[in-house]
């Protein structure tokens, strides 16, 4: 089997073949995910909440992401691994490249940054230096204090138009992938159709090219804080491997996310 690359994701978009992705933080789970057919994994700064017990992603450091990226890479050497750049690690060009290089050396295939068109010069700079970039728009958790909480984004016409403009700007700057979080289905459809790069949704309906879930949400182990867009696949199956396979299959077949997991 050959390694999964961004070329595969582009081909899947062209073929209208939906794909599932998931967050991973260690070797055991990344190996299990890959064995059950998930080829793309994100070492997310969500680990600040799910693994470290913080109330946000803000305390996560590059050192944390490097460590978990190394673990995930060992468990799934053929997966396409995305790694988050934590809060305040891409404030200047010099800092950005240094931090991104650390993640790439740790085993990431691509780095993910949160932000709109203001990030375009940063995306261009990284792309020119052979660092593939995934953008992240909509509800960007590192901006939770600006948003005033975890709220749906892009509901007004002006906000929706701005988000679409941001997505196009990131693509033009060289982003090869986009995560779209907690936006209305209609807006997610506009963005997915407007971009030539694959769009991965979370809380964006089933109209995007791919889906991503935090593994703890997909397995129902986040307690009372499970978001509306999540589904507990372990409750359906009673077995972790079966749950992961079910998640992947429901995404590929367009069953998940359903209307009950979507926003308008």
From Swiss-Prot:
Alphabetical list of InterPro entries matching this protein: Pantoate_hydroxy_MeTrfase, Pyrv/PenolPyrv_kinase-like_dom, Pyrv_kinase-like_dom_sf
GO cellular component, one term: cytoplasm
Enzyme Commission code(s) on record: 2.1.2.11
Disulphide-bridged cysteine pairs: none
Keywords from the UniProt entry: Cytoplasm, Magnesium, Metal-binding, Pantothenate biosynthesis, Transferase
Cofactor: Mg(2+)
Top-level EC class: transferase
Pfam families assigned to the protein according to its UniProt record, in alphabetical order: Pantoate_transf
Superkingdom to which the source organism belongs: Bacteria
Compartment(s) where it occurs, according to its Swiss-Prot or TrEMBL record: Cytoplasm
Catalytic activity: 3-methyl-2-oxobutanoate + (6R)-5,10-methylene-5,6,7,8-tetrahydrofolate + H2O = 2-dehydropantoate + (6S)-5,6,7,8-tetrahydrofolate
Magnesium as UniProt keyword: yes
GO molecular function: 3-methyl-2-oxobutanoate hydroxymethyltransferase activity; magnesium ion binding
Positions of 3-methyl-2-oxobutanoate binding: 45-46, 84, 112
Catalytic residues of the enzyme: 181
Cofactor binding annotation: Binds 1 Mg(2+) ion per subunit.
Protein's pathway: Cofactor biosynthesis; (R)-pantothenate biosynthesis; (R)-pantoate from 3-methyl-2-oxobutanoate: step 1/2
Keyword Transferase: yes
Family classification: Belongs to the PanB family.
Role description: Catalyzes the reversible reaction in which hydroxymethyl group from 5,10-methylenetetrahydrofolate is transferred onto alpha-ketoisovalerate to form ketopantoate.
Record protein name field: 3-methyl-2-oxobutanoate hydroxymethyltransferase
UniProt organism field: Pectobacterium atrosepticum (strain SCRI 1043 / ATCC BAA-672) (Erwinia carotovora subsp. atroseptica)
Gene from which this protein is expressed: panB
